[in-house]
Each structure stands twice: as C-alpha cells, then as structure tokens.
C-alpha cells in the first residue's frame, strides 16, 4: 500500500507528533527525521495532514482493535483479565501518546472518528458481555453501560499514566495491575 519512503515519512511524522504535538511538528522536521528532502515529502503526500491520516491506517499507528480480539469463557475474572491483557497489548502507551498528539484543533475533525473507534469498540464489547453475565445472574448491577465505561476507564487510566509518566507515578507492573484491578472490580459487581 505504501512504499518505503512513505513509511519513513509517516513514522517520522508520528514520532514528532508524539514528542511535540501536531501543531509544532513541521514538514521540514518530518523530512529531516525521515532522511528525505522536503520536496520528496510533498511528492509523496499532499501535506502534513495527509501524512497523519495515511499513518493512522497503518498497524504501527492504529491498534486496530476488533470485537473478535476478545474471547469469553463465562468466568468473570478470567474474561476480564483477558480483556485487560488484550487491551493493554494493543492500546500501548505509544498509542496513547499519538492520540494525545493528534487532538489538535486543525486535525481533530478528521482524526476523532479513528481515535474514538477504539474505546467505542471496547465499551460495546464490555456492555454486551456484562449484559450476558447479568442474564445469567453472575453480576448484580444492571447498569451495563456504566460498568463497561468504568472498566474501560480503569484500563485506559493505567495505560495513560504509563504513557505520561513511565514508572514515576507507579512502579506497579502491568500484570500485577491487571490482576489486582480485575479482582477488585469483580468483587464489586459479583
């Protein structure tokens, strides 16, 4: 789909956006980081916005999370643990940094649907799962939407903190966080 030069340009652009934000990353800096002439950049792409929108289609810059990524066994703890693992495997601190960098007013209208697709997929998957577990009498609450958003926020929060602060806020390892948070969540809804 993209040639090697285009990929270098897209990767350079996204790295700069993570570091500086969309508005502060210039096409000149992108070209230098990619190791190409700025004229080459404009032969390959219409401009910075085109580079970003193209990069958002690449697996390196889009977690491409789908409903089929999640497998359910019917065991609340096991299922939510697996959900968290898949979520954190795909929605990495790097992806969060890119999402933050792309929330620029001049780009937001074009990038928001792609960025929103990931949490919407997760929320819908969780809501449907909680509804099934509610029908089976495994969970008490019937606020499936609320539970889905809370569980998603718990996972996103951890990834966001790691993206923003590394281990400076908490040295808790991902797997320890998943086990502990799932255990507390299940205790609260079970």
Identify the function of each model-found stretch:
Residues 89-97, 110-136, 149, 160:
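Amphipathic alpha-helical packing segments from all-alpha helical-bundle domains
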Residues 44-45, 129:
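Residues in the recognition helix of alpha-helical DNA-binding motifs
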Residues 16, 129, 180-189:
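C-terminal alpha-helix
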Residues 66-96, 145-151:
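Hydrophobic alpha-helical connector segments
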Residues 56-63:
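Short, basic, alpha-helical segments at the C-terminal edge of helix-turn-helix-like DNA-binding modules
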Residues 1-20, 24-39, 43, 50:
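Basic, helix-initiating cap at the start of DNA-binding domains
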Residues 84-91, 98-107, 185:
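Helix-loop "lid/cap" segments that line or gate small-molecule binding pockets
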Residues 134-183:
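Hydrophobic/aromatic-rich alpha-helical bundle segments in the mid-to-C-terminal region
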